Amino acid sequence: MSWTGIALFIQLFFGIIIGLYFWNLLKNQRTQKVTIDKESKKEMEQLRKMRAISLSEPLSEKVRPKSFKDIVGQEDGIKALKAALCGPNPQHVIVYGPPGVGKTAAARLVLEEAKKHKQSPFKEQAVFVELDATTARFDERGIADPLIGSVHDPIYQGAGAMGQAGIPQPKQGAVTHAHGGVLFIDEIGELHPIQMNKMLKVLEDRKVFLDSAYYSEENTQIPNHIHDIFQNGLPADFRLIGATTRMPNEIPPAIRSRCLEVFFRELEKDELKTVAKTAADKIEKNISEEGLDLLTSYTRNGREAVNMIQIAAGMAVTENRKDITIEDIEWVIHSSQLTPKHEQKIGVEPQVGIVNGLAVYGPNSGSLLEIEVSVTAAQDKGSINITGIAEEESIGSQSKSIRRKSMAKGSVENVLTVLRTMGMKPSDYDIHINFPGGIPIDGPSAGIAMAAGIFSAIHKIPIDNTVAMTGEISLNGLVKPIGGVIPKIKAAKQSGAKKVIIPYENQQAILKQIDGIEIIAVKTFQEVLDEILVNPPTEQKPFHIEINKESV
């Protein structure tokens, strides 16, 4: 065989091998495609079957407010939301309030309301983007950030076309998706500090700037839109609505200073009845007034009321009944191991050493605070014992905090000084001040209440049980302003008080809108005594003691 024949044979041999190789590749590709198509058809069929199945609409969805009229008890909060977002220059907002009172529903509705106003910058296509801060996790390397956005560098892109070409791929975050609309962040107080700081920059610039080690302005392979994103940033002109169940002092000052703060309050008993009755009507069930009374004694917000109605209605359905009975409500209470809601009421009659103070808890909720004072003659040197208060408190931020003696305990020392200036000798007595209820009390606003209780206990003069009071007391007997005066007044009214004493400097025009209770503004502790002391059985008139104001 000649060399030419050998060369042709070798070429033919390798040609056959190469042909078999490519034929096998094509066969595998066809097999894979057929397999993928079969799998895709099976999955599509499964999806169609799943989409054909739907359960009934949950009761919580049925009773979700469709308009502002459906949100019960939050007229002031809704008014503030409209003022902040429905004008020509909408602002960022933080909404404080307990869970289940309508914060999210109000946020959804306020954007639709704003679209109706001609001056509003929100257009018809403005979007409402929701994000839960408790699940908004991010990667510190910048690979993923659902809030701000991220860049997928080629090393993380896998087999995509841009990854193989070495092109970084920007991914939009919620701040960009909300461009031209509203970004709602639920539980904004749980947002990671790094994300919070990034968002502050976005709120100022109204843009998101991304960077990548793989980006170069000189790279002509990078598409124009990616060049534009890296050079000019992603648009992020939106208005933020953050909702939280935390107190304002637990939110970073940097974000608070950029937002209008709106407060939603706890629902009152009658308002919870309205929510529960509406829920029962939606599922065509009847519930008696006694049943509503019992239900609202164990619920603290609208969501809990709806859930109880739904479970009780399930009991009625299984027994083919149209009515939700008291027995159904009692069964729900027992099976859910619910505890009754504490509802403090004023005393039945005036008593010595018993005074009605006022406290505020949560973002915008008040409560009546019964204070008990017992005084006995001391065997030797007198003592003072205080129970039911926080002994000390910690203030500051995550990076730095300081501990100090409880403000309530410090207020007691102010009270003793005032009583000494009035000619009394607290050191001659063993004084016990008790704040019942099991919840540690802190703050100086119970100052005048404690002073009144000690004065009453020493002189054996009863205190009017229909009067509640709040105010800090200074060393010279002046009544100083306090916070949370509106929820405190409303709490006094709900507890059955006929009068409420507040510091003179807390007078506001809006207080005139609160009906059903007399509001008395005082400047000195002597004025407090004039309003609260009741004549003892001997018809002895309460005496006046001048306060030494020259010690100021």
Swiss-Prot record:
Residues 349-535 form the Lon proteolytic domain. Transmembrane segments: none annotated. One of its GO terms (cellular component) is cytoplasm. Induction: By heat shock. GO terms for molecular function: ATP binding; ATP hydrolysis activity; ATP-dependent peptidase activity; serine-type endopeptidase activity. Its main location: cytoplasm. The active site is at S445, K488. One of its GO terms (biological process) is protein catabolic process. InterPro entries: AAA+_ATPase, Lon_proteolytic, Lon_Prtase, Mg_chelatse_chII-like_cat_dom, P-loop_NTPase, Peptidase_S16_AS, Ribosomal_Su5_D2-typ_SF, Ribsml_uS5_D2-typ_fold_subgr. Pfam families: Lon_C, Mg_chelatase. SMART domains: AAA. It catalyses: Hydrolysis of proteins in presence of ATP. It is found in: Cytoplasm. ATP-dependent serine protease that mediates the selective degradation of mutant and abnormal proteins as well as certain short-lived regulatory proteins. Required for cellular homeostasis and for survival from DNA damage and developmental changes induced by stress. Degrades polypeptides processively to yield small peptide fragments that are 5 to 10 amino acids long. Binds to DNA in a double-stranded, site-specific manner. Homohexamer. Organized in a ring with a central cavity. This is Lon protease 2. The gene is lon2.
